[in-house]
């Protein structure tokens, strides 16, 4: 997947794109920080 356009899901099995990112708990996908 393209980690720049979509950072990946972090529900259950973490997407490799999420490795250095923050999981957005509400939406269940990865973001650069948790303020979105």
From Swiss-Prot:
Q: Which GO terms describe its cellular component?
A: extracellular region
Query: What Pfam families does UniProt report for this protein, alphabetically?
Result: Toxin_12 (PF07740)
Isoleucine amide sites (modified residues)? 36
Which InterPro entries does the entry link to? Huwentoxin-1 (IPR011696)
Task: Give all cystine bridges in this chain.
Answer: 3-18, 10-23, 17-30
Q: Give the matching SUPFAM superfamilies.
A: omega toxin-like (SSF57059)
Report which superkingdom the organism of origin falls in. Answer: Eukaryota
List UniProt keywords, sorted A-Z: Amidation, Disulfide bond, Ion channel impairing toxin, Pharmaceutical, Potassium channel impairing toxin, Secreted, Toxin, Voltage-gated potassium channel impairing toxin
State the compartments where it is located.
Secreted
- Per its record, what are the GO molecular function terms? ion channel inhibitor activity; potassium channel regulator activity; toxin activity
Known tissue expression? Expressed by the venom gland.
State the protein's purpose: Selective inhibitor of voltage-gated potassium channel Kv10.1/KCNH1/EAG1 (IC(50)=637 nM). It acts by shifting the voltage dependence of channel activation in a depolarising direction. It shows a 100% inhibition at saturating concentrations, shows fast on-rates and is reversible. It also slightly affects channel inactivation, when the membrane is highly depolarised (>+80 mV).
Copy the domain comment.
The presence of a 'disulfide through disulfide knot' structurally defines this protein as a knottin.
According to its UniProt record, which protein family does this protein belong to? Answer: Belongs to the neurotoxin 10 (Hwtx-1) family.
Miscellaneous section: Weakly inhibits Nav1.2/SCN2A (IC(50)=1449 nM), Nav1.7/SCN9A (IC(50)=1528 nM), Nav1.5/SCN5A (IC(50)=7316), and Kv11.1/KCNH2/ERG1 (IC(50)=8511 nM).
Name listed for the protein in its UniProt record: Kappa-theraphotoxin-Aa1a
Organism per entry: Avicularia aurantiaca (Yellow-banded pinktoe tarantula)
């Amino acid at each position: 997947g393209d980690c720049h356009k979509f950072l990946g899901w972090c529900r259950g099995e973490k997407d490799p794109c999420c490795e250095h990112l923050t999981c957005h708990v509400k939406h269940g996908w990865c973001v650069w920080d948790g303020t979105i």
